[in-house]
Amino acid sequence: MADRLPTSTSSGRRRRDGDASIGEFVIGGEIGKGSFAQVYSGHHKNSKAAVAIKSVEMGRLNNKLRENLYGEIQILKTLRHPHIVALHDCVESATHINLVMEYCELGDLSFFIKKRDRHGTNAATEDMARKYPVTPGSGLHEVVTRHFLQQLASALKFLREKNYVHRDVKPQNLLLLPSPGFRKENSRPILTASNDSLIPNAGLASLPMLKLADFGFARVLPSTSLADTLCGSPLYMAPEILRYERYDAKADLWSVGTVLYEMITGRPPFRARNHVELLRKIEATEDKVKYPKDAVVSKDLVKLIGKLLTRNPVERMRFEDFFNDPVVVGPIPGVVEDDIPKVEQKPSRDLRSLEADPQREQSELAKSPRERPLRSPQLPSPDEVRVPQANVSARTGQSPGREIGEGLGIRRPPMPQPSTSAPSRPHRLSNASLNRPPIRASASPPTSYLNERKLRPVTERSMTEQDKAAQDVAFERDYVVVEKKHVEVNAFADEMAANPRLTSLSPKNGQMVRRATQQGPPTSTTGAGRMQPSSAVQIAQGKGRPGHDHPCVSLASRSLNTSSAARAPLRPCTTRSPRIRHRHPLLLLDSSVTADRAHHLTKMHGSSSSSKTSHIVVIVYMALPKSSLSNFSLWHLPWITPWVAPLPTKSMRMVLLSRQRWLCLRRLSCFTSRL
């Protein structure tokens, strides 16, 4: 065991003759003295790292103080925080207990405040004094005050998370170290308890670092518990302690308020010769803290100090509010540019992964734009982007998918050929449409499209067949006139009547596969997918599958031939379909019209019809099973889709056509099966 530590006088002689040692540490000169202990500087024998050694004489302690000392040792062993003085080792002898702790070169906050006018003469504080000079008649600069407050709050928050109450927060127990930058270049190495022990957790890295010390009166005290021990320094005691009342952890907040007041003004808020006089002065203020005339204090600090120095602990600021106060967590105003914390730009996750895997980067670059992952760039608002239709048509005629997809980093399928007879108006690009995930475009509601997508797969066809069908669809565009709510279709029935191949189609395999198209006009720049020709269009254009009969179509053709309307003889359809002289509008009715009412209108108009231009209500979904009613709409007519896409879909249930076209649709099984 080590012998009794020397006094300051003998320590000087010991340094000349050979320093005393305690375990692995060498004792130096005295740097502080308290009621029951002396504090010496020291260093580690091997690393020469500086330490502070607190030597307590056991003979001067009563049982209560001895219990407090052992309690302090147990608490310090469990605490590891950048703003709490760490305990390295504890060496006990017959007469002394020696606590080896972190070394704080600048002393305590009380000394720092008293010597504030001489900060410019100390190399460790010279830069701080130049940037944040002290105002005459006031305390520390507000930037320095807020800096120390944030670090003290960080330490107290750590204690509250462990249900500790310090009970002796005062400037004498707040120790200071030079800033990390100064220590790195000038100071001798300091023995640390952890890797981040000397890295500030709050405040500014360019200013001195604060650490909370002296846990002799600390104890475990949950937020719902009370204590009744009279302890701490009277000038910084909470009034409930001075009144010998039971108190909770909020007593530390009162002490924080007194320390904050002393930092900003240079003196304690209340001074007296004894406890009674001190309590009387506190009661006399009635929670209205007075400041010296020369003190420079911001409104935020005045407000915070008022909340902390509230006599009634119930009305006093809570710890949660204190830790979230803008003064504690917010940026410090008035900081010089050199001290503003630099925000490190960290690479994104994708960039880090590509840097770690060069092969993946090469593979990503090798991918085509269609295969690359979707990224959403920052795009202007919809009002800022207007694309004239003429320009869109010119681009989409070349390679719209590649041009738009590569230019904006968006994966797009090939777009359909634009219509030359579509309404000539500009279309806007929106962030929503450009940032939309790469899916098959659908002009119907999303829910309906998802349900149908699960029920049937989309048939893949070769590009040659797609091009031919797209040309045929382009021929049909010439016979469609778009008016707000009326769409006129003329070519479909004539193609059926004029094409003899329709008689060889099978009713079992004849089905119309719903094609996914993007909502919007045919020249929309939102990246609608290229429409593959549907079965119905192929049937209409004479592209049915050979070897399959379709008696319904044959019946429709015969009914067309026997109708009162004069018809051209059946002939192969090798070119574009003939123009129809009479226009028969396709009317979209509201879904509120019942099936019975529509059937009645069908009979009424059918019996009174004597001309080709008479209109008959056709309920397209009458021949469908109930399970298909919610999914069927005019979107199943692929040549209509580009023209009715901007219209609401829920009202598209009933169609007004001439009798001939109604018979064709009614008898064409591809509209009534496996939709």
UniProtKB/Swiss-Prot annotation:
It is found in: Cytoplasm; Preautophagosomal structure membrane. GO terms for cellular component: autophagosome; cytosol; phagophore assembly site membrane. It is an enzyme of class 2 (transferase). The keyword Cytoplasm applies. Gene3D superfamilies: Transferase(Phosphotransferase) domain 1 (1.10.510.10). SMART domains: S_TKc. This is Serine/threonine-protein kinase ATG1. The lineage of its organism: Eukaryota, Fungi, Dikarya, Ascomycota, Pezizomycotina. The gene is ATG1.
